[in-house]
């Protein structure tokens, strides 16, 4: 599967698993364009609200399991993104700064 097909399949799987997601952002080396064959996919899923962040991250990673891809999924609510997204040095900060919206 090509990289663009893998990305499209992953975005589709995440969007189906999280139908209320406001945005899905690809970040990290794949978004910057400096990925190599060993690079994973890094996704930020922004939802309107998140009751159980850890549980939601696990659930969304499981949605990607059939694709057999190395991926990390961060989940934040829109309010958390607004409050914490400008905190330098955090994964959320870099996801927003370097990432590109792939859904929503």
Predicted regions located by residue number:
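Short beta-strand->loop micro-motif that forms the acidic, two-metal-ion catalytic signature
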Residues: 42-46
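Catalytic core of pol beta-like nucleotidyltransferases
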Residues: 1-23, 31-37, 47-104
């Amino acid at each position: 599967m090509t990289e663009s097909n893998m990305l499209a399949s992953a975005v589709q799987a995440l969007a189906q698993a999280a139908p209320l997601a406001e945005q899905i952002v690809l970040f990290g080396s794949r978004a910057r364009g400096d990925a190599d064959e060993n690079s994973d996919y890094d996704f930020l899923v922004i939802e309107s609200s998140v009751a159980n962040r850890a549980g939601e991250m696990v659930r969304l990673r499981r949605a990607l399991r059939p694709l057999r891809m190395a991926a990390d999924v961060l989940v934040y609510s829109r309010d958390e993104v607004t409050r914490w997204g400008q905190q330098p040095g955090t994964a959320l900060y870099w996801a927003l700064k370097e990432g590109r919206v792939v859904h929503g």
